[in-house]
Amino acid sequence: MGGVLSLSPMVDVCRTPSFNRLEESYGEDGYLSAVMGTAFVKGLQQGDLKKGVGACSKHYLGYGGGGDADEKEMMEDILLPHETMIRLAGCKALMPGYHAVHGTKCVANSEILNDILRDYLGFDGMVVSDYTAIDQLPGLDTPLQKAVAAINGGNDVDFPRGENYQYLQEALDKGLVKKEVFERAVKDVLRYKIRAGLMDKNPYLYSTEDVKLDTKEERQTAYDIASQSIVLLENNGVLPLVKEADVNSAKQVKNILLTGPNANSIWAMCGDYSFPSMFYFWQSWKKKWDDSHLPHIVKLLEAMQASKPEGINIKYSRGCDWTEEIETKFEESGDKRAWEYQLLHRKVDSGEKADKAEALAMAKESDVIVAAVGENVMLCGENRERDGLKLPGKQEEYVEELLATGKPVVLVVFGGRAQVISKIAKRCAAVIQAWYPGEEGGTAVADILYGKISPSAKLSVSYPNTEVYEPICYNYSTRQDARVEWPFGYGLSYTTFAYKNLQAVKELSTASESSNIYFEVTNTGKVRADEIAQVYLSPTQSNQQIHPIQLQGFARISLNPGETKRVCIKFYTDQFGYYSHQGNRQWNIAPGTYELKIGASSQDIRLKQQIVLTGDKVVKPLRDHYFSEVIR
């Protein structure tokens, strides 16, 4: 098994809630996306492309809602993940998006590929087009013209088959491409091959050892990732379903109905471009297929039955399907296989009958209803764009009928992006956003429902309460957007936390490198749990150049009931800075008064302190430091 290049990670700063590829991203915040993307690259590459697998930063620049951003937002937020993956993690491959920036498609955009990427950031890696992106360049009639536009614009490799770049010799002969431009592309590719060891006398291409996949340790990692990513949005006290105080009492929940299209489904467990999802996606037109070679995907029904506490009875009825006629629109542009798929498939087939009458009858006999709803890999992903952000099909109407039984409804929402559920959410006893939780996702959701673990994740997006098709982001204002139901950074727990004793310098020189921040977090409840404390920075005057509020750090803290931990975070002075372009592109750290904020979300700030930056304005081409560091 081996490989020298992975077309990941996708670090688009996704500020449009309806974006069909949001599931692949790290959300709407540039800082968070940069932290996660940089860690991804370091882990994948292992510090040496000859030993690790090369990462590819994509989709450069502004795919997912940032392509129309002004220069300041583009350079401070949208560029940031690509910048840190290149400068801090050594990412040596980059993929431009299909979209346009300032009117020019990214794959042929010299401003972003040559001026910003190479000249400003110093990138010396390889630029590869997204699949067929060069084919789709508008206003150009021939492959020769498209190849000329792309290579002059800064693109090195024509993916997937080089159909346009085969004409580059003709372009050179006709003087349409300068020799130095052609040599740049060739050198970029050769340089990558050398770094990956492909030019060595005996290149290391793959391991000859037996590779064991899907091991016990890997399943545990998958479980940990899932359990730390599931967000509790609402809870009136019904969760956890099993409470220590209620055991052996009349209050103990005994009969649970599990229902909904995602209750017993593999389609909503793994997101787009994960191997199981892609296998099922392309094999689904067959009546039968062999998936015995795939990792076992734990569905919610299986997990709830396998781990149910003594005395609890699980009943199951699907009750509702995603949709009869498939809602997804497949665009003819992009991956041509998806267009072919539209011709082959007209329905998301669950292979299981949905009997609403049966489910509603079971609901009336149950103590609690768990409704597993949302999207699936057929309804969200690249080239799959459905109408609206409400629950697909008649799922909302079905939940209304479940609510009408008078029994408490726990809504578990699966999918790669937020769904507009504001009409029903507040009337549900609890709401869980499970996303695409992976192969151990069913186990993680079940353990949270039963109270074996406490939910701890926070939202990486602003969760909308209405259909939103334009960019929204928490850092546009300190006030919560009226279109947002739950804010960025929000997430409930089965316990409560108190924040206290913030200690930070009150005055700091612009020439200083860093200072430490201290604060304490206490678990004031009765359940062991994790809290994700968040550090934000805000200006105190309207003429300051930084965002009204901006995430600048976070720390996951595990606490037993009654336990207090002191957190120390190193905060770099570069984090007070802002971008400007006054003849030269530069990073500025200006004197002034700023407000440091510690909170449980972007709208739940628990501690504040003003910090005065003194001294002269510091100007540098690029930041020396990007991220705060958790010391303890």
Locate predicted features.
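Glycoside hydrolase catalytic-domain context in secreted enzymes
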Residues: M1-S580, Q586-I598, S602, H625-R632
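Short beta-strand elements
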Residues: D604-K620
